[in-house]
Curated annotation (Swiss-Prot):
This is ABC transporter G family member 9. It holds the Pfam family ABC2_membrane_7. Disruption phenotype: Pollen grains of the double mutant abcg9 abcg31 shrivel up and collapse upon exposure to dry air, and exhibit an immature coat containing reduced levels of steryl glycosides, thus leading to a low viability. Defective in sterol (e.g. 24-methylene cholesterol) composition. Vascular patterning defects in cotyledons and the floral stem, with a stronger phenotype in plant missing also ABCG11 and ABCG14. GO terms for cellular component: plasma membrane; pollen coat. Glycans are attached at N111, N139. Present in flowers and siliques, at lower levels in leaves and stems, but barely in roots. Accumulates in the phloem. Highly expressed in the tapetum of anthers. The keyword Signal does not apply.
Length: 638
């Protein structure tokens, strides 16, 4: 799929609007609002904890400086490539320049300006940021991915059909037409190739015709031909008056000379900033030349940044210190003068731009539009997972097995009946818990990416996710109960069946809410699974079936247990306290259900309290999940 040439000249005609602003959209047209990016004396420090001992005692906090006084400028039409060994601070600098340093992640000092102004929400929403790991939904096709992004990111000055046409135009110009109906795919799901995935990620960002474009190692893991195509796209975008900043790991010679400016980093220190074509001459002037004439410049520069030179007698640390000193002596003053001397009077927004910053307001689209698009996207993404054959088979097998094991159980076998009720509450405690506990950890990267770009509010995302999961949460337990209830011969009164069904559905929603809350709080699948298992098992043990006489000092657990309230309501939905059942050795006696040993301690009072408790849990768990999600995508600026 990745062998087609990238089309550079295809334009998709789009109907003109009433104000005669046509949209023959091309991703390579001039940027609407050129931006000059400056950064001065950037220092970024983080605190790292060093735990000692088996239980992490004697924690020592170490402050590490990631970026050490970086200064530079990138003008419209230029590509700045940041080169350096792993751990040199490239991604940290890119994240800082893109305004995506998360709160609590570290301390950033210095000054970053965009046309001599600090980063605003409006500028941030017209800035593209492509992460190294392509955060894409695996079950969506290429077309669906770009169309949904267009519907969310383009402002309401575009009509819906215009947004769709713009998405398709981007797809055409990036050479993605041949795979437009192919799903993105993932680790265990075959989809588009690596190069096509990267172009889709770039396409998502250039839909808004950004003036600033940040990319984190866009050629990582790609073959040389595909990498050439990606950088060619960046080169064309820059020639349209955009400011492009990218980290690069080890580019080929062809790619190296396509970058206008180069920033070489060594352990967070700048050792070169200037024209990429002048880098080799500069290092030769300070006494560092390659041993062979024909060498990939990036290979030589990475050796330099690692402290590996032609002089084997010079230790790496001494060489790195010398390079930093040479930079401060020979280059720093000229870089500072360039930053100070640049004015941005020419960088005024075009009044005719429909993607100008003032068209966005606080958000590009309304709350309701965001909710509808996110709901539709979520349903399409999960259309194969929600009712997968494995899940449906699991539910039907368990329901029929329960129906057979408890086949037409009469009230004379009261112990068996309440055992079935407890099993129902137990099974439908764990099933929705583990369905929902992975929700937010799996979508963290996507949520981080989209929230950081100001694509939508958190509330429509959260509600669309909750509403979108309702079909799976409600239909499967309904099917389960319809089969099990009547096969097991529980109370044949239709009203009792619907009460039992209502209790079960609320129970499922509460258990699912607990899963959402744990996943959002922990944001780690393994840890959340372990924690969820412990909590739910505790709830079930305190539910009143296994242990009927709980010690006073620990009896409070049942009042926070989902299982306790559900089990009680299921019993209330089947029996009354004065209902009679056969008892005694030969079953000739008649006893009240309320006096049965397995039910007596549960009681038939406080049914309303139990219902209100479950309702409160249903709300509280989701509120906790929402609050926990507010930290995702939250940055220090913008």
């Amino acid at each position: 799929m990745d062998n087609q040439e990238v089309s550079m000249d295809v334009e998709t005609p789009i109907a003109k609007t009433n104000d005669d602003r046509s949209l023959p959209f091309s991703i390579f047209k001039k940027a609407n609002n050129p931006v000059t990016l400056k950064f001065e004396n950037l220092v970024y420090t983080v605190k790292l904890k060093d735990s000692q001992g088996c239980f992490g005692k004697n924690d020592k906090t170490e402050e590490r400086t990631i970026l050490k006084g970086l200064t530079g400028i990138v003008k419209p039409g230029e590509i700045l490539a940041m080169l350096g060994p792993s751990g040199s601070g490239k991604t940290s600098l890119l994240t800082a320049l893109g305004g995506r340093v998360g709160e609590g992640k570290g301390k950033l000092t210095g000054n970053i300006s965009y046309n001599n102004k600090p980063l605003s929400k409006a500028v941030k929403r017209t800035t593209g940021f492509v992460t190294q790991d392509d955060a894409l939904y695996p079950n969506l096709t290429v077309t669906e991915t770009l169309v949904f992004t267009a519907l969310l990111r383009l402002p309401n000055s575009f009509k819906k059909q215009e947004k769709i046409k713009q998405a398709k135009a981007v797809m055409t110009e990036l050479g993605l037409d041949r795979c437009k109906d192919t799903i993105i795919g993932g680790p265990f799901l075959r989809g588009v190739s690596g190069g096509e995935r990267k172009r889709v990620s770039i396409g998502q960002e250039i839909l808004i015709n950004p003036s600033l474009l940040f990319l984190d190692e866009p050629t990582s893991g790609l073959d040389s031909t595909t990498a050439q195509r990606i950088v060619s796209i960046l080169w064309e975008l820059a020639r349209g008056g955009r400011t492009v900043v990218t980290t690069i790991h080890q580019p080929s010679s062809r790619l190296f000379y396509m970058f206008d400016k180069l920033l070489l980093l060594s352990e967070g220190n700048p050792v070169y900033f200037g024209l990429g074509s002048n880098a080799m001459d500069y290092f030769a002037s300070v006494g560092y030349s390659p041993l062979v004439e024909r060498i990939n410049p990036s290979d030589f520069l990475l050796d330099i940044a690692n402290g590996v030179g032609s002089d084997e007698s010079q230790r790496p640390e001494a060489m790195k210190a010398a390079l930093v000193a040479f930079y401060k002596t020979n280059l720093l003053d000229s870089v500072i003068n360039e930053v100070k001397g640049q004015d941005d009077l020419c960088n005024k927004p075009r009044e005719s731009s429909r993607v100008a910053t003032n068209t966005y307001g606080d958000w590009p689209t309304t709350w309701w539009q965001q909710f509808c698009v996110l709901l539709k996207r979520g349903l399409k993404q999960r259309r194969h997972d929600s009712f997968s054959g494995m899940k449906v088979a699991q539910i039907f097998i368990v329901s029929f097995l329960c129906g057979l094991l408890w086949w037409q159980t009469k009230i004379s076998r009261l112990q068996d009946q309440i055992g079935l009720l407890f099993f129902i509450s137990s099974f439908w405690a764990f099933f929705p818990l583990f369905q929902q506990i992975f929700t937010f950890p799996q979508e963290r990267a996507m949520l981080q990416k989209e929230r950081s770009s100001g694509m939508y509010r958190l509330s429509p995302y959260f509600l669309s996710r909750v509403v979108g999961d309702l079909p799976m949460e409600l239909i499967l337990p309904t099917c389960f109960l319809v089969i099990t209830y009547w096969m097991a011969g529980l109370n044949h009164n239709l009203a009792n069946f619907f009460v039992t069904l209502l209790v079960l559905l609320v129970h499922v929603l509460v258990s699912g809410g607990l899963g959402l809350a744990l996943g959002a709080l922990v944001m780690d699948q393994k840890s959340a699974t372990t924690l969820g298992s412990v909590i739910m098992l505790t709830f079930l043990l305190a539910g009143g079936y296994y242990v009927q006489h709980v010690p006073v000092f620990i009896s409070w657990i049942k009042y926070v247990s989902i299982g306790y309230y559900t089990y009680k309501l299921l019993i209330l939905g089947q029996y009354t306290a004065n209902e009679l059942y056969p008892c005694g050795d030969n079953g000739k006696l008649r006893c009240h259900v309320g006096d049965f040993e397995g039910i007596k301690h549960i009681g038939f009072n406080s049914g309303l309290v139990s219902a209100l408790a479950l309702t409160a849990m249903l709300v509280v768990y989701r509120v906790i999940a929402y609050i926990a999600l507010t930290r995702i995508g939250k940055t220090k600026s913008g």
